[in-house]
Amino acid sequence: MLTTFLPILASSHYELVVHLASARPVELDALFWAVADPNSAKYAQHVSADELRHLAGGTPAAAAEAGAWLSKLGGSNVLVSPLGDRVTASFDADADKDASRWTARGLPLASSKPPSAALVVRRDVDKPPATFHRPMVEAPEFGPSVNDQKAAYGIPKDLAATDERTIQMVWGPGTFGFKKSQLRAFKAEQDVAINLDKVKFDTANHGRSGGDNFGEGSLDVRQISSFGLNATTLVSNTNTSSSTEEGQGFGLAMLDFVSELASRASVPQVLSLSLGSLSPTSCDKLCDEATKQAGGAFTLAACRSYLQTQRQVCMFESPAQVELIDRGLQALGLRGVTVVGSSGDGGSHWSFGPFEGFGAIPTALNKVGCEFMFPIYPSPSPYMLSIGGTSWQGDDPSKPVAWRGSGGGFSWQFGAPAHQHATVASYLGKTASLPPASSYNASGRGYPDVSAISADGTSQSSPTVGGIFSLLVDARLRAGLPPLGFVGTRVWQVAAAHPGEAFEDVTVGNSKTSCDNGFPATEGWDPVTGWGRPKWDGLIKYFGSAP
């Protein structure tokens, strides 16, 4: 049980959110993997929101207990989420409170919380404007044209979805969004048949140009709508607070989003998540090691504060928060959503690259950053497909190589799922020049799973692969088959059993970036480009048909 918070201001109103422990976590996990396994009798038998509530949500008694606790604290408008996993109440900051129940930061005392509370979060109406010391990302390079990329993957230029039920989605908070005029210009420039009428927002927030996440949203929209031609594309921005753009407000926004989306009566079949940062476990390890090695030059608190000044480096509050986000991703897989996400742009060591400056803290962090592997989140989650990056050697589309920043490695927090065990053991057993064994978690979830072109980041490759899977889902719907849902198990089974058919192996590259050690690309799966880049004929053969 953990209490966490966003920066607290003198705002007049705020909310407390109690995230409840799952009522049946073991059963939820077992069902997820059964529904995801093509060899299981339950394969692709996705569940409704009502069915999911009994697994992912808390018990009715726990929800009632949390609601009573919030009311006792002075909360009003107490609401239980549709999935039964959260209880929210509104508070007036100016109201009189019993000081014995609250901390100086305006949070309930840990000793007073009900035992069923997995996480308690404070949402403030107002957030401080963020100031970060790493420059904003410039407009990304696009690299090869859409049609050249399609040709390299064997995808017909004008192959498009034809079933009106096919829906794909991209999400981000803060300034995340796009302008239809820019998408129209991109359509003409790239000679790609994007159906502009089927690209729409599903929220009242439409983003704001000039922000880093607006550029992210624009890239996501053009990629997924170009590769998932004619599928309905939903653009979702569920939280415009400035704290969600670059800092720890992002983790709260993602937790809210995945929890809410899984509770909807209707969900998209494909969701691409390009944004992320180092995982909270990586951030903790980074500062723990740096502080230890610095010999008193700075404190652990100072190190953690420094990381919060770095753009999109540590955007999640805690491992406990990440576990709840994972529960939401698990729920989405059970609903029939294929979730894909960027593997990161800093190889195995960074969020983007080394820390800037010559002070004691960045110097120590850069040393530790190269000594250990620091996975990102969310794409190394066991419950989504992680997408790495490739480029073309000498601009030759027949010679794919790993993109220089393609993120990859092994999660510190999550163990490898069963479908990875044999392949990962083979990679670690046969590959020369691996990083020191103490620098990574050999039993962790390996990532990425597959890759695609990333001229200037895996934020390009994730929606690309998302769009491709939308075409596969469309073919399945037209054939009377269910959507794919979580596809990781099937990807690994197909790639291992039919090497080179659905994914073209990429054997050139390394995840070391600016450091002197990293994971090398090799024959078969590797933690640089995964199983390689898409091959349409194999994909439609093995994913567009039964089961």
Kindly label every feature range from the protein language model.
Residues 460-473:
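Active-site-proximal alpha-helical segments within enzyme catalytic domains
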Residues 81-83:
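Short, glycine-/polar-rich solvent-exposed loops and beta-turns at beta-strand/coil boundaries
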Residues 2-79, 88, 93-342, 346-347, ...:
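Substrate-binding/charge-relay-adjacent region of secreted/lumenal peptidase catalytic domains
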Residues 195-197, 235, 340-341, 386-388, ...:
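Acidic/polar loop patches that form or flank catalytic/metal-binding clefts of enzymes
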Residues 349-357:
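Active-site-proximal loop/short-helix segments
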Residues 427, 437, 473-527, 547:
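An often Trp-containing, charged/polar helix-loop segment at the C-terminal end
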Residues 352, 382, 386-424:
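Polar, glycine-rich mid-to-C-terminal structural blocks
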